[in-house]
Amino acid sequence: AELLPNFYKVTHSEHINETDWVVQVMLNPQHAIYNGHFPQQPVVPGVCMLQIIKECIEKIQQAPLQYKQIASCKFLSVINPNETPELKLSLTIKKNETDTFQILAEGVSSKDICIKLKAQLIGK
């Protein structure tokens, strides 16, 4: 289940190879979260980007997951959902013996890299 219903929808998901996926996401610029973040100048909250990435990986793995560790997370550009509602997520997912998933994620909005993430997810 999505933490924020109607915040985004996956429009395309492609399995590139054993560990790599590309997921296209369409943000909903009308979502109520933007009334507070921020009025007249909507910006996707960074924590919501982390949630979108986690939920996309949960769908791919067909299992509930949670962040175990975030080794690095860089927010490189602001996403205004009115101007650039489409996101492209490049995901590398490697499963360890311990049921931990090593994640490399990069999000691109209108040709600008908006997030780079290196993290570990683990089953709930």
What residues fall within each predicted segment?
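Catalytic strand-loop segment that frames the active site of acyl-thioester-processing enzymes
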Residues: 2-44
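Hydrophobic beta-strand-centered segment that forms part of the acyl-chain substrate-binding groove
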Residues: 54-92, 99-100
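Hydrophobic beta-strand residues in large extracellular and virion-surface proteins
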Residues: 10-13, 57, 87-91, 103-105, ...
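Acidic, aromatic-enriched beta-alpha/helix-loop junctions
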Residues: 39-60
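Intrinsic-disorder/low-complexity, polar/charged segments enriched in Ser/Thr/Lys/Arg/Asp/Glu/Gln
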Residues: 18-22, 48, 86-88, 102, ...
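Extracellular/lumenal ectodomain signal focusing on beta-strand-rich modules
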Residues: 12, 69-72, 116
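HotDog/MaoC-like acyl-thioester-processing domains
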Residues: 92-124
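Hydrophobic residues in beta-strands and at strand termini
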Residues: 27, 75, 121-123
